[in-house]
Amino acid sequence: MNKKNALLMAYDKAGIADFARGLISLGYAVYGSKGTVEHLAKDGVQAIDIAGIVGEPILGHRVVSLSREISAGILARDVEEDRAELTKHGITWFDLVCVDFYPLAKELADPAHTKDSVIEKTDIGGTTAVRAAAKAGRVVICEPVDRE
């Protein structure tokens, strides 16, 4: 696996295009969630939509990146056995995960928040990807300021 792969899932899109350009200049292939890929495309940055790996988002966009394929690509160990299993199943290895979370604290601070609005701002897929990346010793970026 010569080319490195980065998974970008950004709620806050500020600076994500420049970050992706930097990764590409370092030899990374950039993968992303649909919204991130669409934003990058508008800025002229080519990225691969993970929907091609996991299918289109479902349940009102609640399930986007939660999948065996994404988790395995992040959690696989850098050993021949795991790499062979990824290859066998056509799963992409991810070297870097860049996720910023939905603004849950901001939503909770809004006096007009509702149970449903809080539920919608509770990030599951991003949290799962970040925890998997941390467990696997991958590069993890969670704050937009760290993309600069």
Question: Which residues make up each language-model segment?
Answer:
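N-terminal glycine-/serine-/threonine-rich phosphate-binding loop
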Residues: M1-I50
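Glycine-rich nucleotide/cofactor/substrate-binding loop typically near the N-terminus or early
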Residues: G35-L104
